[in-house]
């Protein structure tokens, strides 16, 4: 039986969850990355983590990295990118994909105070052409060094904390965002 203090903490945390800020990992193959992204999702209050993989049984979270954060997330598995992004669009979310395309917006130029799914591609190939074609926004993290990109989990953390910063500045963490049916 949870203590009163534990119940209060859980209520406080749940009241800050952001049901309309969702994260999608497309074809991620390195368990460390999926684990680190799950931990970052939980830290910023993103409740839903979607994983696109034809082999969901191979997606294993490393508890040493997640610190059991996945326990507090709703994790959804999808066989295909079209399936996942169609479901999210059907829920009224806009799709923002990370890409190295020169036409992409800097990640700080995106308005994160809207229903949004952030899609991160796999470590080797990045985002698929399918995800690009289904996206509403294309974003990138500007760089001035010689490397083209950052590690997947680092990119996700940078972008999720920009979403957190914008939503916090607009008071989105000060009022409960989960509907009663999910909050209870």
Give residue ranges: language-model regions.
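Post-transcriptional modification and biogenesis factors for structured RNAs
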Residues: 1-184
């Amino acid at each position: 039986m949870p203590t009163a203090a534990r119940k209060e903490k859980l209520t406080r945390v749940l009241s800050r969850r952001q049901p309309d800020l969702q994260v999608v990992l497309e074809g991620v193959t390195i368990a460390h990355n999926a684990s680190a992204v799950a931990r970052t999702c939980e830290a910023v209050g993103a409740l839903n983590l979607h994983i696109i993989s034809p082999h969901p049984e191979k997606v294993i979270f490393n508890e040493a990295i997640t610190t059991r954060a996945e326990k507090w997330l709703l994790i959804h598995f999808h066989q295909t990118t079209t399936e996942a992004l169609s479901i999210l669009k059907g829920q009224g979310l806009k799709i923002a994909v990370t890409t190295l395309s020169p036409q992409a917006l800097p990640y700080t130029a995106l308005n994160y105070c809207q229903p949004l799914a952030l899609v991160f591609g796999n470590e080797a190939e990045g985002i698929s052409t399918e995800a690009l074609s289904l996206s509403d926004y294309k974003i990138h993290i500007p760089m001035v060094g010689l490397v083209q990109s950052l590690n997947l989990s680092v990119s996700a953390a940078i972008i999720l904390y920009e979403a957190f910063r914008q939503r916090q500045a607009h008071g989105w963490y000060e009022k409960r965002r989960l509907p009663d049916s999910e909050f209870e």
